[in-house]
């Protein structure tokens, strides 16, 4: 059963579900799910993780697959506030980590504005877990002391991009692009890396997609 709140204001947990493998869910995330009255979950959350929630907890699918959002972000923000005001324990379940390109910051802002108690539960980001499961260390003492994580899918309503792909391409260290499959050709064209640079740094290129979700 979820927690009883006696009509008092509830609480919202912004929970990172990790990169897909249910075994990588944190203990704190599991505790939050076990106490949930409502779970609002994303496309990238492994369905098995929902089994930690009470059988009578309401499950609401928010989508978040590329541009296919079951619930637009503004409406989603309002929903989290509404459910919490009703006195419910709400778990907002997100793939990876809520604050790594997960729009958790936007949701936290709206909850704070509405005076809703909330807590951030970090999750393991696919930016490090994906490469690790593929046998790729994102840092190495002998050859890589820098890690750059960037998105391949910026807000389309922005007037100008804040990412300079050409500079990222020339930088040392490991580069991890998230949400970039649909933008792969565009980004690689704008991220020129000379063959001399590749040979000098023994650089390898890898595409990792849905590694821990299937």
Regions found by a protein language model. Name each.
Residues 208-214:
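Hydrophobic alpha-helical segments, chiefly the membrane-spanning helices
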Residues 163-194:
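Conserved anion/nucleotide-ligand pocket segment
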Residues 47-48, 66-68, 125-129, 146-149, ...:
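Short gly/pro/ser/thr-enriched loop/turn and capping motifs at secondary-structure boundaries
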Residues 196-203, 214:
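Conserved small/polar residues in nucleotide/adenosyl-binding loops
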Residues 34, 53-54, 168, 192-198:
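Short, conserved loop/helix-junction motifs that constitute active-site signature segments
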Residues 97-171:
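Class I SAM-dependent methyltransferase SAM-binding "motif I" and its flanking Rossmann-like core
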Residues 17-24, 155-160:
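Short gly/ser/thr-rich secondary-structure transition/capping motifs
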Residues 1-17, 27-124, 129:
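Class I S-adenosyl-L-methionine
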């Amino acid at each position: 059963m979820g927690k009883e709140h006696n009509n008092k204001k509830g609480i919202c947990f912004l929970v990172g579900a990790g990169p897909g493998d249910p075994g990588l869910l944190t203990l704190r995330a599991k505790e939050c799910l076990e106490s949930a009255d409502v779970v609002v979950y994303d496309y990238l959350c492994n369905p098995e993780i929902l089994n930690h929630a009470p059988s009578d907890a309401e499950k609401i699918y928010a989508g978040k697959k590329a541009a296919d959002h079951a619930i637009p972000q503004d409406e989603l923000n309002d929903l989290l506030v509404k459910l919490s005001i009703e006195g419910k324990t709400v778990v907002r379940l997100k793939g990876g980590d809520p604050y790594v390109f997960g729009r958790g910051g936007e949701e936290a802002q709206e909850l704070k504005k509405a005076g809703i108690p909330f807590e951030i539960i970090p999750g393991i980001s696919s930016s490090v877990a994906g490469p690790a499961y593929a046998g790729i260390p994102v840092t190495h003492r002998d050859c890589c002391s820098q890690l750059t994580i960037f998105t391949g899918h910026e807000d389309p309503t922005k007037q100008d991009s804040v990412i300079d792909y050409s500079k990222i391409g020339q930088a040392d260290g490991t580069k991890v692009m998230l949400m970039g499959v649909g933008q792969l050709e565009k980004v690689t064209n704008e991220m020129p890396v000379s063959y001399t640079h590749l040979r000098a740094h023994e650089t390898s290129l890898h595409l990792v997609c849905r590694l821990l979700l299937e």
